[in-house]
Swiss-Prot record:
Chain residue ranges for the region called I-domain: 138-230
SUPFAM superfamilies: 5' to 3' exonuclease, C-terminal subdomain, PIN domain-like
Keyword tags: DNA damage, DNA excision, DNA repair, DNA-binding, Endonuclease, Excision nuclease, Exonuclease, Hydrolase, Magnesium, Metal-binding, Nuclease, Nucleus
Name recorded for this polypeptide: Exonuclease 1
Cofactor binding notes: Binds 2 magnesium ions per subunit. They probably participate in the reaction catalyzed by the enzyme. May bind an additional third magnesium ion after substrate binding.
Family, per entry: Belongs to the XPG/RAD2 endonuclease family. EXO1 subfamily.
Protein source organism: Arabidopsis thaliana (Mouse-ear cress)
GO cellular component: nucleus
Keyword Protein biosynthesis: no
Residues the record lists as binding Mg(2+) 1: 30, 78, 150, 152
GO molecular function: 5'-3' DNA exonuclease activity; DNA binding; endonuclease activity; metal ion binding; SUMO binding
UniProt keyword Nuclease, yes or no: yes
């Protein structure tokens, strides 16, 4: 604690100093002040009893700094409890206990900054913590001494007896103890401020000229110290004024008793004991290896002198001074810990480099409130029950790439299938329905060749899908209600049974080759690199669609003859299943075209094959403007579809046809007409009321209020002042 506010008042005589100026000197160090500073970095560990050595490293760094500059340190430790300081120690113990409870509460709530502050106030440097540092000092051959009671009195004894040249401390109690040279506020670089008792008369803020050491001591006790609490409203400046005026403490107390200040009845007796404690406290003499008084014993000490420190046997005093006995229990310490040895190794050796990747993940607690108490516990429980998902190979949906049987005569099939893969908007993780169907058809020996071919294709495709990175397959795509219907159509596609006839596959190739040949011939004739303005793009797109229609019609006519064989295969499929309509998104199909299911080539393992015509560089310019068309199939029997001609479907999907844009003008016109008809009911009529509910102004009634411009101006002359001697003035003028 020290003397509150003493060092700031002595700032004018404090001189900056570096410890290299003390080269060749012996200094006594208040070790507990360094331990308290070092404990700030590990206060939580010390309060919880966790192993740490940061406080020891803090002290040893400064010890090595002193020795580096040629200064010999003597480390002085506090000893047992002093009876005069018992009340103050109990008060500090209660404060530490309260701060520890607050620190645990703040830590539980996740408030780390408040918890750190409370831990710093709750940490207590016990004799066991000091004993760890003593073991390191022994290994480093650094001198130390443990005071029987107070380290301040022990350092004052060493300074008065000239065993040390200066004292390094943070406690201002050393000034009233009578120390001549003190170093305050020493940092890790060796900088500090020096106090010299010879400069006290030159102090500016608090004039101490004419003050003796006794008067200075009485002033400090009167303002409040560790041994006696100050009176209400008594500080350093008021104590200085009273001591300056009355010269001694007994006169000051007598003056205070007759003034408005309330003085306790035992205050004067306590003041005497505090004064004797500063002068005659028991300390350890290293030369005599025995316990003695700080100053010579006076006769007024009395028989009860235990308040300056109870007497103890010489062997116990020596054991405490050497750090072998606990100053509180006066018993030997327990087995030595290995922590101090590790601390010495860390001080003398550089720290080994640890990569950042080895560091453990730090889970910071979240501040608790009504919401976090619910969600945080839920998240912890979820973490405990979490199980990593099993990695399974991805399979295809009808929108993915469909493997085709290689054929030299049909090179366009691979190109078309690759185009459909690149333009496919969705990649799903569903299971392949064709795998189970192939397994069910193993009993038929006629389909073994086709079955083996399909197995190889499916195996190659699965290997290709497994090699695909996970990030590509885990794309989340938000779809509108229109695409919801499209997904239902895709699910219907997956339910279509696979056809295992080679003739169907060959027929599909023939259809695609015919379509490709017709579309290629049309492209050579129509699509040429002609520079056109943007306004002509619409006409050109229309022509492209007309060409595509003709190509599709011709292709369907050529395929019509080959569909008869397909009907037989289709009748083998379960008749109870309904034939869903299958969409074939291609550039040459139109919404009016409806083709039978049998005429569509179906892959044996991956559902409906998707055909698209190639786009050359000229067509890529208009790709964004093209309207995507879909061929739809009527939900009727496949045999009927083979015989029925192409039909038109007037109902079009919203996303696949944007022709409704042309009706916007009609919609807008109708909406305006409805708005006008609705608002016309509020039209103002001369006889009726307004829509606002206010009455219309009356045109027949004239305003009878006179205008402001026609108002008569008041005659100001009647308010003028007329003097009583007016007639006398006129007469004088006449004369």
């Amino acid at each position: 604690m020290g003397i509150q506010g003493l060092l700031p008042l002595l700032k004018s005589i404090m001189v900056p100093i570096h410890i290299k100026e003390l080269e060749g000197c012996i200094v006594a160090v208040d070790t507990y002040s360094w331990l308290h500073k070092g404990a700030l970095s590990c206060s939580r560990e010390l309060c919880k009893g966790l192993p740490t050595k940061r406080h020891i490293q803090y002290c040893m760094h400064r010890v090595n700094l002193l020795r580096h500059h040629g200064v010999k340190p003597i480390m002085v430790f506090d000893g047992g409890p002093l009876p005069m300081k018992l009340e103050q120690e109990n008060k500090r113990a209660r404060s530490r206990k309260e701060n520890l409870a607050r620190a645990l509460e703040h830590e539980a709530n996740g408030n780390s900054s408040a918890a750190y502050e409370c831990y710093s106030k709750a940490v207590d440097i016990s004799p066991s913590i000091a004993h760890e540092l003593i073991q390191v000092l022994r290994q480093e051959n650094v001198d130390y001494v443990v005071a029987p009671y107070e380290a301040d009195a022990q350092m004052a004894f060493l300074a008065i007896t000239k065993q040390v040249d200066a004292i390094i401390t943070e406690d201002s109690d050393l000034i009233p103890f009578g120390c001549l040279r003190i170093i305050f506020k020493m940092d890790k670089f060796g900088h500090g401020v020096e106090f010299q008792a010879s400069k006290l008369p030159k102090n500016k803020d608090l004039s101490l000229s004419g003050f003796s050491s006794q008067m200075l001591l009485e002033m400090c006790i009167l303002s409040g110290c560790d041994y006696l609490q100050s009176l209400p409203g008594m500080g350093l400046k008021r104590a200085h004024a009273l001591i300056t005026k009355f010269k001694s403490y007994d006169r000051v107390i007598k003056h205070l008793k007759y003034s408005t200040v309330s003085v306790p009845p035992l205050y004067e007796e306590s003041f005497k004991r505090a004064l004797l404690t500063f002068k005659h406290q028991r300390v350890y003499d290293p030369n005599a290896e025995d316990i003695i008084h700080l100053c010579d014993i006076s006769d007024n000490l009395g028989e009860d002198s235990d308040f300056v420190g109870p007497s103890m046997p010489q062997d116990i005093a020596k054991g405490i001074a050497l750090g072998q006995l606990d100053p509180f229990t006066q018993l030997p310490f327990q087995a030595e810990s290995v922590t101090p040895k590790l601390a010495v190794d860390d001080i003398s050796r550089p720290k080994s480099f640890k990569p950042e990747t080895v560091k453990k993940k730090l889970d910071l607690p979240v501040q608790k409130n009504l919401l976090t108490k619910y969600f945080c516990f839920a998240s912890v429980e979820a973490k405990r029950k979490f199980k990593a998902p099993r990695i399974s190979p991805m399979s295809l949906t009808p929108t993915d790439e469909s493997p085709s049987i290689p054929d030299d005569n049909t090179p366009d099939l691979d190109a078309l299938s690759s185009q459909t893969t690149n333009e496919s908007p969705v990649y799903s993780l569903g299971e392949n329905p064709c795998v189970s169907e192939v397994a069910e058809k193993r009993d038929s020996p006629d389909d073994d060749a086709v079955e083996r071919n399909h197995k190889d294709l499916h195996h190659k495709y699965c290997e290709r899908e497994v090699d695909r990175p996970k990030s590509d397959s885990l794309k989340v795509i938000v779809r509108s209600k229109y695409f919801k219907q499209k997904q239902e159509d895709k699910s219907l596609k997956q339910s279509i049974p696979c056809l295992n006839d080679c003739s169907v596959i060959g027929q599909r190739k023939a259809v695609k080759t015919v379509i490709n040949m017709s579309s290629a011939s049309k492209r050579e004739e129509s699509h040429r690199a002609i520079a056109t303005s943007p306004c002509l793009h619409h006409d050109r797109i229309y022509n492209d669609h007309e060409d595509a229609k003709e190509a599709s019609f011709s292709a369907m006519n050529e395929v019509a003859e080959r569909t008869i064989n397909t009907h037989k295969i289709n009748h083998q499929i379960n008749e109870e299943e309904q034939n869903p309509s299958v969409e074939i998104p291609s550039a040459f199909s139109t919404p009016e075209n409806v083709i039978p299911l049998s005429s569509i080539a179906i892959d044996s393992c991956h559902g409906v094959a998707t055909g698209k015509r190639k786009l050359d560089s000229d067509e890529n310019l208009h790709k964004e403007n093209l309207k995507s068309k879909h061929m739809r199939m009527d939900e009727t029997d496949t045999a009927l579809n083979a015989e029925t001609p192409l039909e038109t479907d007037d109902v079009e999907k919203f996303g696949s046809n944007i022709s409704h844009i042309g009706h916007y003008s009609e919609i807008a016109e109708k909406s305006v007409e409805r708005f006008v008809s609705a608002i016309s009911s509020f039209k103002y009529s001369g006889t009726g009321s307004r829509a606002s509910g206010l009455r219309a102004p009356l045109k027949d009634i004239r305003n009878t209020c006179p205008s402001k411009g026609l108002s008569l101006k008041p005659d100001i002359s009647k308010f003028g002042y007329a003097s009583s001697n007016r007639h006398m003035v006129t007469k004088s003028r006449r004369m």
